[in-house]
Amino acid sequence: MIKNPKVLILTAHYGNGHVQVAKTLEQTFRQKGIKDVIVCDLFGESHPVITDITKYLYLKSYTIGKELYRLFYYGVEKIYDKKIASWYANFGRKRLKLLLQAEKPDIVINTFPIIAVPELKKQTGISIPVYNVLTDFCVHKIWIHREVDRYFVATDHVKKVMVDIGVPAEQIVETGIPIRSSFELKINPDIIYNKYQLCKNKKILLIVAGAHGVLGSVKELCQSFMSVPDLQVVVVCGKNEALKQDLVGVQETNPDALKVFGYVENIDELFRVTSCMITKPGGITLSEAAALQVPVILYKPVPGQENENAMYFERKGAAVVIRDDSEVFAKTEALLQDDMKLLQMKEAMKSIYRPEPADHIVDTILEENHVEPNHIPIKSPALAQSFT
């Protein structure tokens, strides 16, 4: 039995999702009394210049580099076993060896497909349990390695795909993707309406624009949606200050019809009162939408994991996928007017959702390593406490 295990969580800053999952797992371990938890961006610390370049190319995949990213994602999938694995396995290895020697972790968790640890296990024979937490509703071969002890996946569909390509079923646990604990609390919606100055008798369209430019014509769309009766449009611009300033002028023409925000810390509050949401199909965003049963409109998914996520939610009836700019307004307006369709999408989201995935993952890891959790109560947010 390990009395006070040290946990190393490896991640990468490609989008915010992988890091957010790492932080959620870190918080969950700490809630259960495991204090020695380290989160490390292995690639960023090992090769900062290469990482910055690849992050730039990743962000460009939202605008000019979609075909390039398609070739990378699906091309690597086909040739990975033959040509890529040996190079990728050594990426970050020097930094990793120093990290393992200095910290001596008892458990290693990957929230990004980093195979340096399992490859090191294979080559040196070191004994350390390795867990991969997949952060999308699909699986790429780059996640899979014989020396990984267990995989935590979003759905039974992902598990079946992995079994089909040779991963033993007993090594795969369907838990859902870890999301922030705030998405699993109960909150009185009346307080949210008051906080954001929203009318509870009107439908709400939430557009999560963010820094990467989910929509190319947000301003024009907002102007069109503002003419729809009994509709409020809420736009979250994230850290895109230029977009926010551009929309503030539009908001001033009719502040009751359009609300513009920058970065919203407690974005779950807006998820709770929205009728549907336009967003990009990241695995964490979709998991959060499923937790709160928010119908989603997925705009122009980037080829690769985002497209795979979008197709899964579309097949399940939880999302409308739009691939053409000219269809955004008409299809969104039609959905907002179709209460039966919205209800069906909410039910589909409910069927996808897996409750408390972070707890499930952490409890499984602690149990397998014979650690008795010591739960530390965490104070709930004020809005959650006000639920009646």
Curated annotation (Swiss-Prot):
It is found in: Cell membrane. Keywords: Carbohydrate metabolism, Cell membrane, Glycosyltransferase, Lipid biosynthesis, Lipid metabolism, Membrane, Transferase. Pfam families: Glyco_tran_28_C (PF04101), MGDG_synth (PF06925). InterPro entries: Diacylglyc_glucosyltr_N, Glyco_trans_28_C, Glycosyltransf_28_UgtP, Pro_diacylglycrl_glcsylTrfase. The keyword Membrane applies. CDD domains: GT28_Beta-DGS-like (cd17507). Transmembrane segments: none annotated. It catalyses: a 1,2-diacyl-3-O-(beta-D-glucopyranosyl)-sn-glycerol + UDP-alpha-D-glucose = a 1,2-diacyl-3-O-(beta-D-Glc-(1->6)-beta-D-Glc)-sn-glycerol + UDP + H(+); a 1,2-diacyl-3-O-(beta-D-Glc-(1->6)-beta-D-Glc)-sn-glycerol + UDP-alpha-D-glucose = a 1,2-diacyl-3-O-(beta-D-Glc-(1->6)-beta-D-Glc-(1->6)-beta-D-Glc)-sn-glycerol + UDP + H(+); a 1,2-diacyl-sn-glycerol + UDP-alpha-D-glucose = a 1,2-diacyl-3-O-(beta-D-glucopyranosyl)-sn-glycerol + UDP + H(+). It is an enzyme of class 2 (transferase). Its EC number is 2.4.1.315. GO terms for molecular function: 1,2-diacylglycerol 3-glucosyltransferase activity. GO terms for biological process: enterobacterial common antigen biosynthetic process; glycolipid biosynthetic process; lipoteichoic acid biosynthetic process. The keyword Cell membrane applies. Processive glucosyltransferase involved in the biosynthesis of both the bilayer- and non-bilayer-forming membrane glucolipids. Is able to successively transfer up to three glucosyl residues to diacylglycerol (DAG), thereby catalyzing the formation of beta-monoglucosyl-DAG (3-O-(beta-D-glucopyranosyl)-1,2-diacyl-sn-glycerol), beta-diglucosyl-DAG (3-O-(beta-D-glucopyranosyl-beta-(1->6)-D-glucopyranosyl)-1,2-diacyl-sn-glycerol) and beta-triglucosyl-DAG (3-O-(beta-D-glucopyranosyl-beta-(1->6)-D-glucopyranosyl-beta-(1->6)-D-glucopyranosyl)-1,2-diacyl-sn-glycerol). PANTHER family: MONOGALACTOSYLDIACYLGLYCEROL SYNTHASE, MONOGALACTOSYLDIACYLGLYCEROL SYNTHASE 1, CHLOROPLASTIC. HAMAP family: Diacylglyc_glucosyltr (MF_01280). This is Processive diacylglycerol beta-glucosyltransferase. It comes from Bacillus thuringiensis (strain Al Hakam).
